[in-house]
């Protein structure tokens, strides 16, 4: 058994004192139940300073994920400060190196979101990181952006972004494998496999996403959407409905003889909601993973 706390956002490090207030209580709960505690942080990296990471390392900081969507000229055009429009690459890069050099983490997951905006523009990112000599300390997470639900409170929302900059399946496969090969050419270990479903919070019977006001969601992608709230702390709702549906989906996949079930888990429940149809990523998984196997082991 393991009690895993993943600080996610929005930006989870925006109010570091909230973490400082909460972590001792979470550790106390874990110790009272005799189970280890692991802490993870998924952050944009701007506020991943040595001060807060040193604090979190005292709570078994097992994973730090930051996002770099390209070299400075690309990343800073997408991820800049709200008021000044100043870029964030340099700050994130500095925080990454400090985290590794000071031993707060042994490895950093670098998330790179792939879309038409940064297509063919990622080589200098790998060149910069390779010059730092951190190839053995970087785990690459390549993300193919997907559609989402409209949000009336946010003009020009993420669903509109996908309509303009999202890839078709053929484009996604081609770009994913190109970027993986490019990373390998600079000494980084490319992703070993593309997985969807099995590691998702929505699939796990003892995993939940908790919002800032104690609201509980089953899917991370539904946070902030009141219609998807399934409960409120301290009461934890039943997970039976999701588990039952997941098992039925997996049974259907197995009946069809699909060999992707272990890395698919029946597909993404959120994408089913977005697209109004059963989500079956079989073709995408087969094509990308075949390419990754070839990249790793040759023909």
Region spans (language model):
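Flexible mid-to-C-terminal extensions adjoining Fe-S/redox cofactors in radical SAM and related proteins
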Residues: 221-299
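Radical SAM enzyme [4Fe-4S]-AdoMet core and its adjacent flexible, acidic
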Residues: 73, 77-205, 209-213
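Canonical radical SAM enzyme core domain
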Residues: 12-74, 81-94, 112-124, 145-147
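Active-site groove signature of glycoside hydrolases
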Residues: 1-12
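Short, well-ordered coil/turn segments that N-cap beta-strands
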Residues: 1-3, 34-39, 60-62, 104-108, ...
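Buried hydrophobic side chains on well-structured beta-strands
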Residues: 5-7, 41, 66, 110, ...
């Amino acid at each position: 058994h393991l009690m895993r706390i993943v600080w996610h956002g929005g930006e989870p490090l925006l109010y570091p004192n909230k973490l400082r207030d909460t972590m001792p209580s979470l550790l106390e709960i874990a110790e009272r139940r005799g189970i280890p505690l692991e802490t993870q942080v998924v952050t944009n990296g701007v506020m991943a300073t040595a001060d807060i990471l040193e604090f979190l390392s005292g709570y078994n900081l097992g994973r730090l994920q930051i996002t770099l969507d390209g070299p400075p000229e690309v990343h800073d055009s997408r991820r800049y400060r709200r008021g000044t429009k100043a870029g964030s690459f340099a700050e994130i890069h500095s925080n990454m190196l400090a985290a590794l050099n000071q031993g707060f983490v042994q490895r950093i997951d670098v998330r790179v979101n792939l879309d038409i905006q940064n297509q063919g523009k990622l080589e200098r990112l790998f060149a910069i990181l390779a010059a730092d000599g951190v190839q053995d300390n970087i785990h690459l997470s390549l993300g193919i952006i997907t559609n989402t639900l409209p949000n009336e409170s946010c003009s020009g929302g993420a669903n509109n972004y996908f309509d303009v900059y999202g890839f078709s399946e053929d484009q996604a496969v081609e770009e994913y494998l190109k970027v993986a090969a490019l990373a390998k050419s600079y000494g980084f270990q490319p992703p070993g496999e593309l997985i969807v479903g099995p590691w998702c919070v929505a699939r796990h019977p003892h995993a939940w996403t908790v919002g800032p006001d104690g609201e509980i969601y089953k899917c991370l992608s539904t946070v902030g959407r009141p219609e998807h709230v399934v409960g409120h702390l301290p009461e934890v709702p039943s997970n039976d409905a999701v588990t039952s549906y997941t098992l039925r989906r997996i049974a259907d996949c197995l009946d069809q003889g699909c060999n992707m079930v272990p890395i698919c888990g029946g597909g993404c429940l959120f994408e089913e909601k977005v697209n109004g149809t059963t989500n079956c990523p079989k073709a995408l998984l087969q094509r990308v993973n075949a390419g990754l196997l070839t990249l790793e082991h040759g023909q």
